Amino acid sequence: MANEVYANNMEISCKAANGKSIAAFPDVCFTPPQAPPTPLGVPIPYPNTGLSKDTTKGTRTIRITRKEVMLKNKSYYKTSYGDEPGRAPKKGIVTSKIKGKVYFTSWSMNVKFESKNVVRHLDLTTHNHASFPGNTPVWPYLDQATVDAGGGPCSNEVKKEKKDCADFKPHGSKDACAGLGAGKPSGKKTSNEADRLADKVAARKCLTARRCALQPYKPNSCCPQQTAHHLIEASALHDKGRGGKGSVPLKGISNYSENKAPCVCAEGVNQNVGTHGLMHTFQSAAAAKSRSGTLQLSNGSSISAKKTTYGTAKRQSMAAMGKVFPQSKCSKECLSAQLDNYHKQCGINARTPIKAVETGQTDVTAATQAIKTRNARLGATRSRVR
């Protein structure tokens, strides 16, 4: 049952909770038989599950329902379940373990117990650790909340993904990314590789449904051939750069990480090609209408730049998604909830001033025609975000 203790409107993870990190995939482990041509065993991906009841090294003095609470970079689930058949001597392909620990890779930015950040419902995990890194990619942490009950702003998208991806991992045994190509497409403007990849993805119901599930920049669950695109540009939140060395965040913004910020899985390795390029085109065209002004920085200084607000940039990014990915039909309620879930932790709200970023191509007419041509090829009906 839920323990009704929240941080940033998300339930805090504790040993007393019924929380799970479900079906993290793939946890690749060597599995018998061990014989030529696979003397180490057959490498097989397994779905993993971690349970809150296995919380270890939590809080010492603060309790929820009389039990310890998960903390940043200290606590973990002592066991993950699902990879037990991978019992060849080598075991996990990365960690040489099975049933390894589960660690969290995100947490509340501003709520702390015992001077450490608390972990919450829907924070991200990696599974089957001997020590960091784990064998599996991150997977959302689930607890007693609306997603568990099949409700919430993404309820329709969750149901659609389960239906359209029933045959694909983690629900089934097939790989949704199979057949998309050997690697990422060329980033040259003269190449149409990214467009061909976009056609393949748009024709697959599972991948178009999964487009609505925003991903961190890295690690993420996009197909290897795809590229994660920030819906709110990382550079919009800093004086220069994307938050690395030498970047100063705008006033009021803290603990932002470009690697953890929400992205859509797009096609194209840069801002000039494929659906990645189309997203930049529409978002940049909207940003170009912004007026120049002064933006205050967190260090007390200021810069002059075209400025907008987070709320406006969010609406523009969702509108761009509706144009570029009409097959996905992601609702604005679902996208908005996911974007807000992260950015509010960084001190950002709808009125927060940010930079209006213009990158990539600028020909909206050509971009619109490219989408119409693709839709005609796919027999799709063009639609915007609802």
UniProtKB/Swiss-Prot annotation:
| Superkingdom classification of source | Bacteria
- Identify the enzyme class: hydrolase
- Enzyme Commission identifier(s): 3.1.21.1
Subunit description: Interacts with Tsi7.
What biological function has been recorded for the protein in this entry?
Type VI secretion exported toxin that via to its DNase activity induces growth arrest and ultimately DNA degradation within target cell. The activity is initially neutralized by a cognate immunity protein Tsi7.
According to the entry, what is the taxonomic lineage of the organism?
A: Bacteria, Pseudomonadati, Pseudomonadota, Gammaproteobacteria, Pseudomonadales
Task: Give the catalysed reaction(s), semicolon-separated.
Answer: Endonucleolytic cleavage to 5'-phosphodinucleotide and 5'-phosphooligonucleotide end-products
Provide this UniProt record's keywords sorted from A to Z.
Hydrolase, Virulence
Q: Which GO terms describe its biological process?
A: protein secretion by the type VI secretion system
What is a GO molecular function of this protein? deoxyribonuclease I activity
Q: Which InterPro entries match?
A: Tox-GHH2_domain, Tox_PAAR-like
Q: Which Pfam families match?
A: Tox-GHH2, Tox-PAAR-like
The protein in question is named DNase toxin Tse7
Q: Does the keyword Ubl conjugation apply?
A: no
